[in-house]
């Protein structure tokens, strides 16, 4: 990337690296995570001001065509203050200070589709968790509107384009695609795949992956700060 000429650069690269003998290729050992067969839950008690709820659902990476529908699904749920989660939990129900979802298809291995919510003081953790489940069920029962779908596609497309607003960022994106095994051509195919996603695709992946048996739930329970340990007074600071 940058102001370089291939006809002058390639001979230099060959001169420097071609004499180096090729070593044996390392044997790839990839562990496959077993299928999750039921919900997992954990509570974490730490010093904090408000509770925090997180849901994680196992989903595929770039190697599955479903990854593009999941990318659009994330945008519908949590991109901006007009998103479904923000409108429902923050504006309407007022039980969360912040809420959203996260997913990245550019991963070496299958990944997670996250939901998170920062619980409003005075609201119950169970209420917020149930509200997240209702939004998931809503998507499973009703596909997004054409307006929602097109807005999400526009957001994902704009983010992808602006991510490559410099040669450095473009090179980093191509390098990431190569390093995880996706191949650099997948970067050029991304927008075409995103534009092909339909509302029925969104509903289908929500039904397939956002299920109770496929989720892990983590909840942060706030604890009061520990009392400060008393400091020695000046009279006791010296040696006896």
Predicted regions and their residues:
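Charge-rich, well-structured scaffold segments of protease-associated domains
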Residues: 1-25, 43, 53, 92-240
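His/Glu-based metal-binding/catalytic segments typifying zinc-dependent metallopeptidases
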Residues: 25-84, 176
């Amino acid at each position: 990337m940058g102001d370089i000429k291939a006809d002058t650069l390639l001979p230099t690269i060959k001169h420097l690296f071609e004499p180096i003998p090729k070593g044996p290729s390392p044997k790839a050992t990839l562990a496959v995570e077993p299928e999750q067969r039921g919900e997992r839950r954990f509570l974490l008690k730490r010093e904090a001001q408000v509770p925090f709820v997180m849901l994680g659902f196992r989903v595929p990476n770039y190697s599955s065509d479903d990854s593009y529908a999941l990318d659009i699904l994330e945008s519908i749920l949590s991109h901006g203050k007009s998103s479904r989660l923000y409108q429902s939990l923050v504006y309407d129900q007022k039980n969360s200070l912040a809420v959203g979802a996260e997913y990245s298809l550019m991963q070496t291995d299958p990944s997670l589709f996250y939901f998170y919510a920062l619980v409003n003081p005075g609201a119950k953790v169970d209420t917020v968790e149930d509200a997240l489940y209702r939004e998931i069920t809503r998507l499973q029962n009703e596909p997004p509107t054409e307006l929602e779908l097109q807005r999400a596609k526009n957001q994902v497309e704009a983010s992808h384009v602006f991510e490559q607003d410099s040669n450095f960022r473009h090179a980093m994106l191509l390098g990431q695609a190569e390093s995880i095994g996706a191949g650099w051509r997948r970067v050029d195919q991304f927008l075409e795949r995103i534009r092909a996603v339909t509302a029925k695709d969104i509903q289908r992946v929500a039904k397939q992956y956002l299920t109770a048996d496929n989720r892990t739930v983590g909840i942060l329970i706030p604890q009061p700060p520990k009392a400060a340990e008393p400091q020695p007074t000046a009279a006791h600071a010296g040696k006896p």
